[in-house]
Regions:
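Basic- and aromatic-enriched surface patches that contact anionic nucleotides/nucleic acids
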Residues: 47-127
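Short alpha-helix boundary/capping and kink motifs at helix termini
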Residues: 2-56, 60-67, 71-73, 78
Length: 127
């Protein structure tokens, strides 16, 4: 499966109305790609936290889910008075990977456990 490019995400958010609002100014493209590949393969994820259409937790999962046409549960979250909405067209999609190899492995293990599948299947999906 091909990776989603920065240009493809920017074109998508520019051409589409995104239901939920971001509260982040930057997101990590490699993280989105790993989640996207897993979602396309049917790997389940926990819900994202939302309050008043603002994403409190789960920005990478949300964008990946839209691109993969994957339904994600929405659970109540909490925002503060300082939390601001960020237009998706203003979000920077960074190509540098924010996760260390150790964190990627830990997340893969969590996903394998959550889905009750061998970690080798998760690792294979990401190749």
């Amino acid at each position: 499966m091909d990776n989603i490019t920065k240009e493809a995400i920017i074109a998508f958010v520019s051409a589409n109305e995104i239901e939920l609002s971001s509260t982040h100014t930057k997101l990590c493209l490699p993280v989105i790609n790993r989640i996207y590949k897993k979602m396309c393969a049917g790997i389940k994820f926990s819900g994202i936290k939302v309050e008043n259409n603002l994403i409190c937790d789960g920005h990478h999962r949300y964008i990946a889910s839209i691109l993969a046409d994957f339904a994600l549960e929405r659970i109540p979250g909490n925002v503060t008075s300082a939390t601001a909405s960020v237009d998706w067209k203003s979000v920077a999609f960074e190509e540098e990977d924010w996760d260390t190899l150790a964190k990627i492995n830990m997340l893969n293990e969590q996903d394998a456990d959550y889905n009750n599948i061998p970690i080798a299947k998760i690792v294979e999906l990401l190749k």
